[in-house]
Amino acid sequence: CCDDSECSTSCWPCCY
């Protein structure tokens, strides 16, 4: 996962 400001919810594939 990533540690984005909006993708840091849990482990969403929006940062892949």
Swiss-Prot record:
Disulphide connectivity of cysteines: C1-C15, C2-C11, C7-C14
Tissues where this protein is expressed: Expressed by the venom duct.
Claim: Kinase is one of the keywords in the record: no
Alphabetized GO MF terms: toxin activity
GO CC annotation, single: extracellular region
Subcellular location: Secreted
Keywords: Disulfide bond, Hydroxylation, Secreted, Toxin
Positions where 4-hydroxyproline occurs in the chain: P13
Keyword Secreted: yes
Major subcellular location class: secreted
The record's note on its domains: The cysteine framework is III (CC-C-C-CC).
Family note: Belongs to the conotoxin M superfamily.
Record protein name field: Conotoxin tx3j
Organism for this UniProt entry: Conus textile
